[in-house]
């Protein structure tokens, strides 16, 4: 599992810069990550997750946002770092960076249950993507681009929405075509 985590960070992060981060963007990231997994990492993930592949589980963390039992996780998808400051645990709003570290620890621990590891892997795949969406890591002054109103082909929108999904939707390709 340690090797899988290293590979995920090594190969997913550079590709994140190329894509948006709506459903399709997250699935693209999961699919790209899968192509770089070792055989052993694939076996470990299949043993842990069953038939689910990384691309299909990459959006789970967004899909559970409407579940009241997961409301506490809403601030895990972003972090705010004011201009001129460095990230410091617990100092600023948003917990994405802290949660990535926490989920890596869960995956490494032998004492973690299978269910804890499944949740950790699903969040880890998703949050790595979120942290590399520029509007999920910002100074907080524009609410992650949500306060910046724009027109997208004549339709009212905001910078966050355009960056998150509309840029990819405009290409009209499935995640497997990237």
Region annotations inferred by a language model:
Residues 1-24:
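Bacterial Sec-dependent N-terminal signal peptides
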Residues 19-127, 134-178:
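N-terminal, motif-rich segments that launch catalysis or mediate targeting to/interaction with membranes
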């Amino acid at each position: 599992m340690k090797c899988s985590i290293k590979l995920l960070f090594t190969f997913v992060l550079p590709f994140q810069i190329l894509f948006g981060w709506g459903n399709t963007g997250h699935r693209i990231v999961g699919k790209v990550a899968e192509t770089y997994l070792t055989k052993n990492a694939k076996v470990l993930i299949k043993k842990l997750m069953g038939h689910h592949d990384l691309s299909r589980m990459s959006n789970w963390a967004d899909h559970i946002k409407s579940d009241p039992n997961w409301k506490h996780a809403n601030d895990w998808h972003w972090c705010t770092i004011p201009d001129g400051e460095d990230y410091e645990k617990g100092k600023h709003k948003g917990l994405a960076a802290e949660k990535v570290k926490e989920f890596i620890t869960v995956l490494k621990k032998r004492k973690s249950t299978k269910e804890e590891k499944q949740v950790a892997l699903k969040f880890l795949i998703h949050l790595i993507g979120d942290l590399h969406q520029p509007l999920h890591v910002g100074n907080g002054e524009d609410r992650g681009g949500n306060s910046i109103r724009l027109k997208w082909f004549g339709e009212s929108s905001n910078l966050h929405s355009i960056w998150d999904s509309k840029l990819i939707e405009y290409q009209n390709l499935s995640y497997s075509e990237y």
